[in-house]
Structures are given as C-alpha cells and as structure tokens.
C-alpha cells in the first residue's frame, strides 16, 4: 500500500505523538493517535499505527502493540519510522538480533538518520557485534564530527577489537581538539587522559605511556591511579630505582596495601631471604603500628626467624584484641611446620597468661589485661577447629564463653566448630544464640539465616531474614527483588536436600533471571558512560559482562539445577497418591492411624500457611495496583510465573539441564565439574562423541580425578558393549580416541591400575570400588571392603568423604549392603562423634531450632503426638 502523507494539521499532531513518547506521556500520546486515526482518510496511516503500538507496548499491552505495529508496517513498508518502531518493540522483548534487522531495514530508507544509527550502535555493542559497531560509529563520526561521543565511540570500537594503536591515534586526535588550560583541573578530561594511557599500556607501548603520564600528570585528578600506573610502567621498563621510589611513596600513603610491598620487592630484587626481610624491617621502623609489613614476611620465612617474627605479630594482635587474626594467618596452615610453631607459641601464651598475666614468664613489663587471655583462647578454638580437633576447640571456646558470655564473636566461632564437625543443627542453634545478643546486626542475621538453611530450616531462615526486609511484602519476595543470591543458592540446596525439586529449581531459575537482568542492565551504560567519560570503568564493565556467568553464584545454581534434572531423568516424579497407596499397603492399623493423624496435621498446617500466603499475596497485589494507579505510566508486562510443580514435572529434563550447562562450557572451562556434568548428560542421551569430548577435556584438567575415572570406565564399557549399533565414522573415531586414553587394556584392568596408583586416597578408593561393582556385581564384597577402609594412613579421610562413602552404601551403588553400611556408620561415629550423619539410628535431636527460642509450634505438634 503506498504511503499516505499527512496534511499540516495531522502532521503537527504526529509530531506531538513523538514528543509524548519521548517524555513518557503515553496516555496523551494515545489521544493524539486517536485524533489522527479517527479520520477515515488516515485510519490506516502506517506511521501513526506504529507509534500507537509502541505507546501501548509501554503500557504493557504487548499483543495489541505488535498487531498495530505490524499493520502499520504492512501499510508503509518504505517508512523508516515503521521499521524503527518495530525494532524498538523487538528490543523491548530482548530480541536484539531481530531488532538489528529492523534497524538495518530502516536505514535503507533513511541511511543518515542519527537516532536509528545510535540505537543500532547500542544493540551492536550489547550483542558484541564489534565489527558492525565500528562501522556504525564511523558513520556517526562522519555525520557528527563535532560531538565528542562520536570520537570516543569510534575509539572504543577499535579498543574492543584489540586494535590498540588505532584507538590511541583516534583518542590523541580527539584530545587535540579539547581546549583546556594546563593548570585547570577537569574531571572528564582527566578520565579521558587515563583511558588514553590505559590503551597505550594495553598496546604494549610502555615508554609512550610513561611519557604521556608524566606530560599530563598535573591535569589528572586521580593522583593515586597516576602513581600506581607509574610504578607498574617503571617496572615494565626495568627502571627499578625509580620504581622503588614510587612504591615507597605509595607505602607512605597507605602502609596496609599488600600490592605496594610486592611492587617494592620486584623493584629491589632481593637476592636472598634476609635481603627480602630487610625490606619489611625498614617498614617496621617507619610504620610501627602497621600490620601488613609484619604479616607478609611470614609467607616466606621459616624456622627460628619465622617463630621470632610470628611472636611479635601475635603479641601485637592479642594485646590490641584483634578478632580477625586467625583469618589473617589462615593461608599459613598449608605448611605443617608453621602450624606446629603457631600452636607451640599460642598454647605457651595461654599457659603463661593464666599463671602470671604475661606472654612469657621471663618477660619484663606490665601485665596484660584479662581480655588478652580471652583473645588467645578465641584463637586456639579456631586453630584446633582448623586442624580437625573439634573436642579441644569446643573446650577453649566454652572457657572463653564462660568468662565473657556477651561477646558475639565467641558464639560465632562455636557455631562454626559444630558446622565443621558435621552437626549443622547444633551450629544453627548457636548462631541463633549469637543473633539474639544483637538483633540489629545484619551480618549476624544473615549468617544465622545461612546456617538455618544449611540445616534445612527454611521457614525459620525466612523469619530470620524478615527482620531486615521491607514491610508489606514477604521476606522471600523482597530478597528476590534485591537479587540476594547467597540466600537463593542456599535455599535451592536445602530444597534439593529435602527432595523438593520444584522449589529448588524455582530458586535456580530466579538466579538465572538475575544474571539476565544484570546483562540487560548494561544497556543504560552504553550512552551514560560516553556522556560522562567514565571510559575505564565502562570498558571494565563490558569485559565483566562477557564473563558474568563465571560467577560462583551462577555456577552453584547451575550445578544444583543440573543435578536435579539428572535425578528427574533417572527417577521421574510419579503421582503422589499412588506412592501413598503403595506406602500404606503393608502398614498395621496403629501405624496407619498414626500416619493419618500426621497427614491431617500436615494438611491443616499447610492450609493455614496457604491462607496466610494468599492474604499476603492479596495485600501485595492491592499495593501494586495502588502504585500502578498512582503512577501515570506503567512500563512493561509481568514476568512469567515460576510454578514449582511445573518445573519438577518437565518432559525433557536433559534438555533443560543443557540450558544451564552451556554457559558453564563457554565460561567455566577450567573447572573439571563442568565437563563431568556434560558427560553425565550426554551419557544419558547416548551421544558418544560428546561423551568422549567431555572426558578428554576433563582429562586435560586432572587426569586422576575420582569422578572422571568413573566416567571413563562407563564410557569404555558402554562403547565396547554398544559400538555395533554406531555408524562406521563414529565407531572409527571412538576406537582411535579410546586407544589413546586407555591403551591396549580392558575396563577391569584399567580400574585395577587406577586403584594401585591411588590406593592411599579414600576418594579414589571409593570411585574404584563403585567401578568394581559396576563391572562385576559378583565382586560386591571386595568393593565394600575397598570403600569402607578407614586406615589412618589414607589421605582425604575427612568428614565429607566418609559421608559420601556412607551415602554410596545406602544408595545402591554397591548393591544392597545395609549391614555393611551400619558397621561403617558406627566406625565413622567413633572418628566423627559430633557428625549427625553418623549418629545411631534411634538418635533424635531433642532440640528444635527456631527464631530466638520460640518453639511454640513444636510444643503444639508434640502435644498432638502425645
């Protein structure tokens, strides 16, 4: 249909529609659209229909918006406005590739339209189409050479394409156009100079970068960045004396910065340990109260010299009452010799302080205050906890609590000791005690909630967090709004442990949405940073966004989701009623009656909770409606609701698992778990080449990893058994690669070789035992013996590994072995007396963890039981 041109009156109305859209006056814009479209001559005016659709989209009416924009486009295919509007609509739905196509079509009909070019450049940088971004920025530079954003955008395009020299030339040409006095301090010009220097450094032009820095030093506001950069450049250029002077100057600014001491070491190049120590001894004299110059030598000293320096460091900290001293020294615990020296010194302090209130009976000087002994005991509790002696650790912390029962840090450490000893419920109880001492401390509140979640006390954790969340909304919803991912990952783990897979997956998807939001949020910064010239931070932001899903929170959420989907594939959820019928078929009348009572109570409790939840939801909806009515313009539509039941009953769990796996394969290649999870998925999908690829990638990271060994045996065995059904090409590739991985052997021999090579490691023995049973179920007895050995000479004979062995005995990986499991549990209970996992079968916790001792719900339930 040919385009209809508007007469002056309607054209003026159309311009007002554009202004209303720009100023977010959407309802006024719709009125003007109506005035044009109500005229029969212009009822099908393409550009007006498109603008009406765009306005409706901003009011959340998405379907109607798409219909109108498409109708407008059909009526005027040669209109750049219609194509531009269609692109904006696609952009609002995060369909960036489609939006780019629309913008390109718009530019066919108006190639020099600045707004379309700017919008296109934003999408190109968002999608990291760097070649396209460079071309678009070049067009913008040609059209608006006087605008600084045109120059800077073009330079950034070359910088991101790693053509540093070209980027530096463009920035220099632009800098010449800036009229600034050498004595005038201009923040934006200062940032431009620092960005230019960064580009020169990344280009490897260190000499030019140093000259540039010295030339414009007076005009740069960030003096600290100037000095730090100068120090790095002087080191790169081997001007070591000058570099040493710079780092000494930086030390005077901040004697507690570790990096300045490392820089000074590089500049002075000490030949031996004593020369290296001399650097720090000079700092002791200059900064007598400095902790860092006393702490850093402990990393490289040993023997008597280490003991002497450690003695001074510990005395200084214990006298001052410095709680984080253990965390400061934690990295030294990798060295057994240093651990022994630490223990000797601190135990000696405790003995001496008790007898004569001095660190050493031979000391001359004033007596230490009673608090010094407290901090020594506090340290010793953490020390013995770290080296795996919880009983001694508890003795020290209990003594400290008896002397000072109001110090929160003591209760925190007691909770940690119980957690490390395997009793998370007792740990949560003590963390709750700590929280009760200071209910206004948000850190303790969060710590307490975290421990409760680890103990699977989700409701109690939510109540704990509600003390610091917004009133009027539930704590969970508010924490989700605030992107509180530590809470959500812990929640997901707790729900998974309770086999509430739907709820766990909901949390994983909420975390996934946070990362999508963070990626989308960078959109606003593409224009803001150009305008404000915060270019160093902008480039850092872009680099961070590229690897965002490397973050531990995403990895944890993805791991939990993948593990759940693998379980759902292996054991799909069945109808609950059928399960209950099967469970109750063999019960006695008394047991059945007890079960029915329990079910009724659970049903009643669930009903009350549901009513409470609905009431909260209604209240929240009323608040949202009120907010919507008050706010003249509501933008965007609601997100799709995450329903746990639907998430748990997904038809293709492996496909869903792959969605979480893909970012890990791209960004977390260095973690072996990524490739082993990939193997587990492809093994179930029977994708042999992808299984082989996953095993090879994992093998390159850690060839002797226990889980990798299991994967290799399963691949080897499956390939041997099922190779006849594969195509010739796949079979040939498999044969070649398998020979490289395994040599001329069979799965059984390969497993035996692995066992001989790692016979002193408990995790490796467990994996080998699993494979013994997997390859030959008649060898169950030998497999159980291999897994359940608790010899003192074994490495990694820790709580976590022993729990994994017990779980293996229970889950059927070694066949039916309940008797062996019970014997192993009893043996482990002697080794780890506090661990809940190894408590006797009749053992029941006599305490319930609730928020600050409120156990009314538990008392009511107990009364019902009686």
UniProtKB/Swiss-Prot annotation:
Give start and end residues of every TPR repeat: 46-79, 80-113, 148-184, 224-257, 374-407, 409-441, 485-522, 672-705
Report residue spans for region: Disordered. Answer: 579-642
Major site of localization recorded for this protein: cytoplasm
Is Phosphoprotein included in the keywords of this UniProt record? yes
Region (Interaction with HYPK) residue ranges read: 500-866
Q: Compositional bias (Basic and acidic residues) spans?
A: 579-594, 606-621
The annotated regions of Basic residues compositional bias extend over: 595-604
Please provide, in alphabetical order, the Gene Ontology terms of the cellular component aspect for this entry: NatA complex; nucleus
Highest taxon of the source? Eukaryota
Task: Tell me which Gene3D superfamilies the record gives.
Answer: 1.25.40.1010, 1.25.40.1040
Q: Where in the cell is it found?
A: Cytoplasm; Nucleus
* Signal peptide from the UniProt entry: none
Sites where Phosphoserine occurs are at 302, 537, 588, 855-856
Residue positions where N6-acetyllysine is found in the record: 262, 735, 756
Pfam family name, one: NatA_aux_su
Reported function: Auxillary subunit of the N-terminal acetyltransferase A (NatA) complex which displays alpha (N-terminal) acetyltransferase activity. The NAT activity may be important for vascular, hematopoietic and neuronal growth and development. Required to control retinal neovascularization in adult ocular endothelial cells. In complex with XRCC6 and XRCC5 (Ku80), up-regulates transcription from the osteocalcin promoter.
Q: How does it assemble?
A: Component of the N-terminal acetyltransferase A (NatA) complex composed of NAA10 or probably NAA11 and NAA15. Interacts with XRCC6, NAA50 and XRCC5. Associates with HYPK when in a complex with NAA10. Interaction with HYPK reduces the capacity to interact with NAA50.
What name has this protein been given in UniProt?
N-alpha-acetyltransferase 15, NatA auxiliary subunit
Recorded name of the encoding gene: NAA15
């Amino acid at each position: 249909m040919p385009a209809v041109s508007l007469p002056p009156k309607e054209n003026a109305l159309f311009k007002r529609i554009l202004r209303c859209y720009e100023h977010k006056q959407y309802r006024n814009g719709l009125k003007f659209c109506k005035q044009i479209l109500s005229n029969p001559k212009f009822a099908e005016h393409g550009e007006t229909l498109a603008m009406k659709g765009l306005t409706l989209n901003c009011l959340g009416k998405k379907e109607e918006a798409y219909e109108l924009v498409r109708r407008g486009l059909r009526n005027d295919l040669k209109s750049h406005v219609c194509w531009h509007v269609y692109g904006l609509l696609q952009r609002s739905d995060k369909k960036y590739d489609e939006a780019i196509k629309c913008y390109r079509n718009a530019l066919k009909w108006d190639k020099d339209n600045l707004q379309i070019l700017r919008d296109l450049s934003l999408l190109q940088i968002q999608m990291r189409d760097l070649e396209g971004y460079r071309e678009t920025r070049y067009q913008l530079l040609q059209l608006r050479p006087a605008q600084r954003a045109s120059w800077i955008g073009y330079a950034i395009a070359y910088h991101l394409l790693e053509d540093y020299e070209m980027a530096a030339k463009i920035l220099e040409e632009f800098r010449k156009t800036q009229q600034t006095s050498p004595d005038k301090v201009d923040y934006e010009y200062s940032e431009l100079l620092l960005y230019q220097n960064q580009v020169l450094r990344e280009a490897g032009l260190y000499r030019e970068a140093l000259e540039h820095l010295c030339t414009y030093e007076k005009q740069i506001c960030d003096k600290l960045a100037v000095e730090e950069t100068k120090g790095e450049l002087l080191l790169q250029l081997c001007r070591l004396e000058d570099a040493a002077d710079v780092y000494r100057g930086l030390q005077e600014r901040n004697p507690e910065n570790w990096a300045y001491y490392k820089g000074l070491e590089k500049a002075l190049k000490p030949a031996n340990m004593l020369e290296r120590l001399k650097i720090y001894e000079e700092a002791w004299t200059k900064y007598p109260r400095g902790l860092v110059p006393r702490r850093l030598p402990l990393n490289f000293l040993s023997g008597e010299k280490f003991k002497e320096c450690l003695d001074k460091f510990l005395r200084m900290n214990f006298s001052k009452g410095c709680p984080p001293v253990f965390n400061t020294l934690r990295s030294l615990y990798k060295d057994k010799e240093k651990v022994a020296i630490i223990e000797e010194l601190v135990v000696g302090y405790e003995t001496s302080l008790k007898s004569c209130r001095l660190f050493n009976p031979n000391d001359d000087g004033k007596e230490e205050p009673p608090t010094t002994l407290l901090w020594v005991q506090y340290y010793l509790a953490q020390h013995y906890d770290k080296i795996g002696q919880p009983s001694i650790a508890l003795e020290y912390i209990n003594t400290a609590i008896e002397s000072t029962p109001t110090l929160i840090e003591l209760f925190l450490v007691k909770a940690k000791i119980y957690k490390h000893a395997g009793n998370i419920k007792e740990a949560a109880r003590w963390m709750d005690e700590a929280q009760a001492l200071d209910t206004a401390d948000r850190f303790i509140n969060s710590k307490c909630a975290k421990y409760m979640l680890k103990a699977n006390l989700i409701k109690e954790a939510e109540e704990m967090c509600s003390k610091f969340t917004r009133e009027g909304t539930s704590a969970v919803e508010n924490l989700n709004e605030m992107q509180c991912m530590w809470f959500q990952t812990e929640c997901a783990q707790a729900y998974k442990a309770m086999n509430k897979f739907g709820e766990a997956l909901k949390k994983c998807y909420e975390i996934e949405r946070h990362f999508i939001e963070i990626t989308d949020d960078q959109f606003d910064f593409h224009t803001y940073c150009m305008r404000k010239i915060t270019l160093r931070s902008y480039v850092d932001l872009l680099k961070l966004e590229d690897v965002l899903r490397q973050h531990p929170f995403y990895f944890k959420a993805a791991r939990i989701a993948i593990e759940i989907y693998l379980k759902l594939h292996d054991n799909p959820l069945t109808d609950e009623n059928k399960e209950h019928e099967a469970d109750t078929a063999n019960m006695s009348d008394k047991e059945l009656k007890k079960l029915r009572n329990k079910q009724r109570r659970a049903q009643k409790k669930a009903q009350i909770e549901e009513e409470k939840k609905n009431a909260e939801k209604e209240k929240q909806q009323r608040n949202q409606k009120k907010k919507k009515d008050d706010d003249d313009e509501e933008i965007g539509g609601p997100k799709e609701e995450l329903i746990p039941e639907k998430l748990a009953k997904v038809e293709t769990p492996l496909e869903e698992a792959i969605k979480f796996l893909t970012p890990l394969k791209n960004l977390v290649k260095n973690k072996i778990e990524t490739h082993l999870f990939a193997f587990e998925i492809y093994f179930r999908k029977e994708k042999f080449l992808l299984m082989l690829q996953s095993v090879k990638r994992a093998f390159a990271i850690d060839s002797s990893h226990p889980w990798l060994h299991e994967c290799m045996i399963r691949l080897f065995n499956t390939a041997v058994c099922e190779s006849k059904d594969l195509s010739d090409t796949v079979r040939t590739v498999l044969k070649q690669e398998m020979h490289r991985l395994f040599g001329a052997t069979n799965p059984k021999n390969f497993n035996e070789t692995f066992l001989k090579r790692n016979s002193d490691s408990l995790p490796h023995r467990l994996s080998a035992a699993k494979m013994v049973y997997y390859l030959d179920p008649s060898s169950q007895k030998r497999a159980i013996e291999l897994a359940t050995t608790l010899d003192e000479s074994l490495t990694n004979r820790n709580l976590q590994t022993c729990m994994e062995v017990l779980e293996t005995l229970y889950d059927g990986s070694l066949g039916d072995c309940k008797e062996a499991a019970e014997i192993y549990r009893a043996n482990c209970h002697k080794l780890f007396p506090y661990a809940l996992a190894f408590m006797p079968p009749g053992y029941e916790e006599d305490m319930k963890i609730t928020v600050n001792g409120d156990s009314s719900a538990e008392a009511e339930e107990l009364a019902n039981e009686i």
